[in-house]
Amino acid sequence: MTSVPANAIGTGGTYGGVEGEEISAEASQSRIKVTQVSGSTGGKRGTLSSTDLNWEPPPCWYEPLFTPEQLKTFAETNGNGQVSIRQGWIGSELWTDHFRDEKDANNYFGTPSMVKGYKNYNLGKKGYFWHGVAPDVNSIDDTKLCNRLMFWQNAGDIPDDPNAPTPETLADYAYNKVKVPETAVELKPATKSTVNLPTWVWLDKGTFQEVKVRAELPNTGLWAETTAKPVALHLNPGTEDAQTFPASGDCEINADGSIGTPYSTGDADKTPPCGIRYLKATNGTPYRLSASVTWQITWEGAGGTGGDLPDGTFETTQDMNVQEIQAINR
């Protein structure tokens, strides 16, 4: 029997709990269930980048893992797993000593401490043994975070702990699960722009719709829905030798969900509400036009909770070839 750092025994990409007939104790992945409630599910999609570079979701939190019966089965038939987010126990004896035979156990990380043992896995009681979860445990600098040894919580109760999950925890988690469509803008001219003549840019209505993702943590009553709403398209022509329309490069989304205005015959000399004018030809090396949609993020959750999260962006790029104006000899 051995007690080792958790990352020494591997995580294997499975989460703790019961998966089919397999019972495991791993801390690398959450048991949060994520479903997309609304929005596009087809075509090329990607995740959002937060516009707030200082924002990031919590690195870890606690989740219910085992019922008393499940812990008994795991301890007596397996016994290899993570008893905390950083500490692994190899061998059934460590598990049975602490969770069956009331033997106190060492928590080596953070502030070392002794943890009081349990009697017979708390069989007959209603509740769950909770443990720390971190999608990337190696990114956590503070070893005290979420590092309690697996602990008991009565059914229906959330731990009184600063790292206990909340609806906002789930909203933050869902933020990184939101997938939005690529920003494939319509252009006119479509294949090659001309120096000093505007290129019209637009997106038809229906291309971008709200995306809503629901996250639920089983056996807690906690849930949150994170909604991403497209609010603007930003154009970067890929060169300083260009003008954008509007000057900021930010094209607002129209009331019907479209962006910009489609080009019509006779519009060549007009200024587009959303577009670009290149001032210099490419001469063999195309400019890289980037188009990024800004998504406004809000959330609502259990208990009437809700609020705003940082806006997110998703960017795509495409080549732009620009030719000189062709002179006409008379």
Would you name each region that the model predicts?
Residues 10-160:
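Solvent-exposed N-terminal domain segments of exported/luminal and surface proteins
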Residues 239, 280, 293-299, 320-326:
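Beta-strand elements of well-folded, non-transmembrane domains
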